[in-house]
UniProtKB/Swiss-Prot annotation:
The keyword Membrane does not apply. It comes from Sulfurovum sp. (strain NBC37-1). Keywords: Aminoacyl-tRNA synthetase, ATP-binding, Cytoplasm, Ligase, Nucleotide-binding, Protein biosynthesis. One of its GO terms (cellular component) is cytoplasm. Its EC number is 6.1.1.21. Pfam families: HGTP_anticodon, tRNA-synt_His. This is Histidine--tRNA ligase. PROSITE patterns: AA_TRNA_LIGASE_II (PS50862). It catalyses: tRNA(His) + L-histidine + ATP = L-histidyl-tRNA(His) + AMP + diphosphate + H(+).
C-alpha cells in the first residue's frame, strides 16, 4: 500500500469539513475589509525566497524543498505565501498604480522539517497582504481582522506584539546586540554563533531553551527605537487598549523571516502544545523594493490552518437537501432524472439501487438529508412520490410534476 510521504497527510471527513469551514470564514471576513483573491504558483525561483525570507533564516538555510528542474533552473516549492504575492504584485505592475491593493490567499506551503503535532512538511495557510498603506492604523486593522476570524471560529488566543524598528534605528541597535552576543557566544548554540556575523537579529528567534534563557538579558530594540517608530508603536498599543484587545509586548519577537520591519505580531494558543503560534505577521515596507518593485509600504499576516484545526468550534450541522431512492427497479431511472432536475436548486443524494423502506431511511440519516423522497410500486403507477420532512416529521404523497 502506498501511503502519504512523511510529514504530509490527507484531509478527509471531519478534517476536510473543518478546513473548508476555516477558509470560508476567513474569506468572508477578509472580503468585508476589501481584500480580493489572488492565486500564485506553488513552484517559484529559489532566488525569490533567498532575497525575501533571507539566506540566514532557518527556512532558506535548512527547510526548503529546493531542486534543479529539467531546464536547469534553481526552483523550490514555496515555504510561505507573502514573497509570492509580492512577486505577483510587481509582475502585474500593480506597484506602479496609485491605488491601494489588498489580497487574500490560501493554499499549501512546504518546509522540510521534523514533523510534529501542528507542524507538517506540507501545511496550509490563509493569508492577507495589504499594499500601499504606511499608517499604523492599517497594522491595527489587520490585527482586529485576525481577532475577528478567530472569534468567528470560536478560538481563544493571546496576542504578542513588538517593533522591529526601521533603517534609522536598526543599525545602532544591531551594533549593541552584536556586542552583547559576542560576550556570551561561547554559551550559545552553533546556529546562533553562525548568525552573529550574518544576521544577529535572527539569534533572537533561536528556539534552543538554553539560548532563550541567555537572550532574556539582551538589549531591547523597543528601548532603542527612533522617534517615528516609537510613536507608531505607542499608538498601536493605545489603539489595542481602546479596542479591548489584550496583548503582551514580547521584546524578543522577531518572526522567522528577514523582511519584517516596525510592527511584528503573533497570535498564540496554549492549547496546542509547544508549537503555540497560530498566526503571525507584520509590516514589510522594503520588500517590494528588494524584489525590484517601486517602494511600497505593506503589511500582512498568515494563519496556520492545521494549527487551528483542532481548536475550531464547528457549527451544528443542519439537515439539508434531499435523499431520493427507488423501492422497485423500474423506478430507478425516474429517481435519477428527478435527482438531476432537483440539483439545479438543492443538494441531492440519489441511491442508484432499489431497496426496502428501512434501508432507504438509514440512507437518509447517513446523508443527513432533510427530505426523504421515495418511489415504490404504487407511486410509479400513480405518477407520485412519497415525501417526508425529517424535521417536521410531516409526510405526504405528491405528484412527480410538483417536486
Amino acid at each position: 500500500m502506498i501511503n502519504p510521504l512523511r510529514g504530509m497527510k490527507d484531509l478527509t471527513f471531519d478534517e476536510a469539513q473543518r478546513f473548508v469551514h476555516i477558509v470560508k470564514t476567513a474569506i468572508t471576513i477578509a472580503k468585508r475589509y476589501g481584500y480580493s483573491y489572488i492565486e500564485t504558483p506553488i513552484l517559484e525561483e529559489t532566488a525569490l525566497f533567498k532575497r525575501s525570507v533571507g539566506d540566514s533564516s532557518d527556512i532558506v538555510s535548512k527547510e526548503m524543498y529546493q531542486f534543479e528542474d529539467k531546464g536547469g533552473n534553481d526552483v523550490c516549492m514555496r515555504p510561505e505565501g507573502t514573497a509570492g504575492v509580492v512577486r505577483a504584485f510587481i509582475s502585474a505592475k500593480l506597484d506602479r498604480q496609485p491605488v491601494k491593493q489588498k489580497f487574500y490567499y490560501y493554499g499549501p506551503m512546504f518546509r522540510y522539517e521534523r514533523p510534529q503535532k501542528g507542524r507538517l512538511r506540507e501545511f496550509h495557510q490563509f493569508g492577507c497582504e495589504s499594499f500601499g498603506e504606511a499608517s499604523v492604523y492599517e497594522d491595527f486593522t489587520i490585527i482586529i481582522m485576525i481577532s475577528q476570524i478567530f472569534q468567528a471560529l470560536g478560538i481563544g488566543f493571546e496576542l504578542k506584539i513588538n517593533s522591529l524598528g526601521c533603517p534609522e534605528c536598526m543599525p545602532p541597535y544591531r551594533q549593541n546586540l552584536v556586542g552583547f552576543l559576542t560576550e556570551i557566544s561561547e554559551d550559545l548554540c552553533t546556529d546562533c554563533n553562525r548568525r552573529i556575523g550574518m544576521n544577529p537579529i535572527r539569534v533572537l528567534d533561536c528556539k534552543n531553551e538554553a539560548c532563550q534563557s541567555l537572550l532574556k538579558q539582551s538589549p531591547k530594540l523597543i528601548e532603542n527605537l527612533c522617534e517615528h517608530c516609537d510613536t507608531d508603536f505607542k499608538k498601536l498599543t493605545v489603539l489595542l487598549d481602546d479596542a479591548g484587545i489584550a496583548y503582551e509586548v514580547d521584546t524578543n519577537l522577531v518572526r522567522g523571516l528577514d523582511y519584517y520591519n516596525k510592527t511584528a505580531f503573533e497570535f498564540v494558543s496554549n492549547e496546542i502544545g509547544s508549537q503555540s503560534a497560530i498566526a503571525g505577521g507584520g509590516r514589510y515596507d522594503k520588500l517590494v523594493e528588494y524584489l525590484d518593485g517601486k517602494p511600497t509600504p505593506a503589511v500582512g499576516f498568515a494563519i496556520g490552518i492545521e494549527r487551528i484545526m483542532e481548536l475550531v468550534q464547528m457549527p451544528e450541522t443542519k439537515k439539508e437537501g434531499y435523499y431520493m431512492g427507488a423501492m422497485i427497479p423500474e423506478a430507478i431511472e425516474k429517481i435519477i432524472m428527478l435527482g438531476n432536475r432537483k440539483r439545479a436548486t438543492d443538494k441531492v443524494t440519489v441511491e442508484y439501487s432499489s431497496k426496502g423502506f428501512k434501508s432507504h431511511m438509514k440512507g437518509v440519516d447517513k446523508a443527513n438529508a432533510r427530505y426523504a423522497l421515495l418511489i415504490g410500486e404504487d407511486e410509479l403507477k400513480n405518477g407520485t412520490v412519497w415525501l417526508k420532512d425529517l424535521e417536521t416529521k410531516e409526510e405526504k404523497s405528491i405528484l412527480l410534476s410538483e417536486v
